[in-house]
Amino acid sequence: ISADCHAGAELLEYRPFLDKEYVSQFDAWAETYEVPYEDLKGPDGPRNWDSDRRLADMEADGIVAEVIYPNTIPPFYPKSSLTYQPPPANSGDAARRWAGLRAHNRWLADFCSRTPGRRVGICQINLHDIEASIKEIRWAKSAGLTGGILLPGVPPGVGLPELYDINYYGPLWAACEELGMPVNHHGGSASPAMTEAVESPVIF
């Protein structure tokens, strides 16, 4: 069993999983969006979303089941949600980012359902809205994303309290405990914003 696999939809595959009110905005955004990661654009990119190819590759490696973290770009996000994200520019930006995360979670639930018992998906949340995060966690549990939640990093400059702030995050921890949802954190996701220098990604 692999406890740290990554997957996600090809960009346009997220479209049917978006709330209807965001579809036209997504079309406009996707028209000019350039995927920034070469590995997602090359011949190995489909390993993230091609279910049959993924199964074949897993079986060739002797892997019978996997825990799935995100690897692609959620709609309306400037880059991978595993990395530093600047605070939303405004309420519209915040709402669109949430719509993108929900689309990813829905896609992932569908992806996992195609191979019962072999894929365990991890739900993404946005810590800028704890109430919405709790609602999404409850949905994830009901949708079979039993891998729990992905706790985003909180580096300086994102406009959020440190993760040990019980007054802010307490309701989130309580909901995870109530639902039996594991809390996952991916290494590197709390790295602060760096320069554009070539060596900066090493910090991740």
Predicted regions and their residues:
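Helix-coil boundary/capping segments in enzymes
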Residues: 1-204
